[in-house]
């Protein structure tokens, strides 16, 4: 007999007194929440399985998922993070992201996850869920997409007026406060676009496989040093292309460029980040074997970076 010390409850409130719900909407919503639950459990290395429990209710619709696993406390932590992330808006009133995600946010999130995971493994009593971790997870693109899919499905189903989530114990008594999101707030969770901010790699190195000098519509091919993957990229450094066309720089097999690389990204339906295009804006230097040549535009770029660094130092200590 499986013991269920933890349960997750989702209540859908309706604009009428019925107790039925569109099956397609219900299953689409459940898919997004279960996906978030699985990702959180994997991130924190918590072994758990979710089950379905029948529950009757007059007016509205109630879903209860009994959760089984090795640690009641760890499961409770996962459920509480899930509830906070699910009910924390992604966008402002104007439709802009509440948080501008940066690379340091990704690093901090992984650091906070590691600390909480360690705390759970050591079974430290009274370990709190860091607020910073909840905020970082709530703005994580993967979870933003899950939330967007969830609330977009409900927005298209006018019958639902609000949702509530809470954790229950084995006797279906509340283990946590109930968190609520009303219909008029749904838009604050729905992404306006799947496009993500372009990231800039100022220290990219690409081994050129095949250049294209005559037609800017075609992409170059090279091996990107981050992960060693082969990429197709646009060369938008016109000075560099002219230098190669005029044979001031000659292409040789094995030639590498250190450059500024812009990477355009978007979210997939599953919340995965996909790189959709690569663009080299500035070639800083060329390298072949032990020979390195800094380009004129590369010198200008390096001087600009140095000036910005000095200005930042003055601002900090001035």
Regions picked out by a protein language model, each given a short descriptive name:
Residues 1-201, 211:
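Charged, alpha-helical interface segments at or near domain boundaries
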Residues 14-16, 210-212, 261-267:
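Beta-strand elements of well-folded, non-transmembrane domains
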Residues 199-216, 220:
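Structural detector for short beta-strands of small beta-barrel domains
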Residues 206, 249-273:
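Flexible glycine-rich surface loops and low-complexity tracts that mediate binding to linear polymers
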Residues 221-226:
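Short, acidic/hydrophobic/Gly-rich beta-strand patch recurrent on exposed beta strands
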Residues 228-250:
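Beta-strand/loop nucleic-acid-binding surfaces
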Residues 264-299:
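OB-fold/S1-family single-stranded nucleic acid-binding modules
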Residues 288-318:
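Extended, charge-rich, solvent-exposed interface segments
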């Amino acid at each position: 007999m499986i013991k269920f010390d933890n349960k997750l409850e989702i209540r859908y409130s309706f604009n009428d007194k019925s107790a039925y719900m569109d099956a397609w909407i219900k299953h689409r919503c459940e898919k997004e929440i279960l996906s978030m639950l699985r990702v959180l459990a994997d991130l924190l290395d918590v072994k758990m399985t979710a089950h379905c429990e029948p529950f009757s209710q007059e007016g509205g619709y109630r879903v209860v998922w009994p959760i089984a696993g090795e640690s009641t406390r760890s499961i409770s932590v996962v459920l509480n993070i899930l509830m906070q992330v699910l009910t924390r808006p992604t966008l402002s009133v104007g439709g802009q992201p509440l948080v501008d995600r940066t690379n340091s946010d990704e690093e901090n999130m992984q650091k906070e996850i590691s600390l909480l995971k360690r705390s759970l493994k050591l079974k430290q009593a009274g370990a709190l869920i860091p607020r910073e971790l909840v905020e970082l997870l709530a703005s994580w693109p993967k979870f933003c997409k899950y939330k967007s899919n969830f609330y977009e499905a409900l927005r298209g189903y006018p019958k639902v007026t609000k949702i509530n989530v809470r954790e229950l114990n084995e006797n279906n008594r509340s283990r946590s406060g109930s968190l609520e999101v009303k219909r008029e707030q749904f838009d604050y969770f729905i992404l306006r676009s799947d496009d993500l901010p372009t990231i800039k790699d100022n220290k990219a190195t690409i081994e050129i496989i095949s250049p294209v000098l005559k037609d800017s519509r075609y992409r170059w091919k090279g091996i990107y040093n981050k992960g060693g993957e082969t990429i197709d990229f646009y060369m938008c450094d016109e000075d560099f292309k002219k230098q190669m066309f005029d044979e001031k720089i000659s292409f040789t097999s094995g030639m590498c460029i250190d450059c500024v690389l812009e990477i355009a990204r978007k979210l997939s339906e599953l919340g995965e980040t996909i790189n959709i295009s690569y663009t080299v804006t500035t070639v800083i230097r060329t390298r072949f074997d032990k020979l390195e040549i800094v380009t004129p535009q590369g010198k200008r770029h390096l001087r600009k970076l140095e000036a910005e660094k000095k200005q930042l130092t003055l601002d900090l200590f001035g």
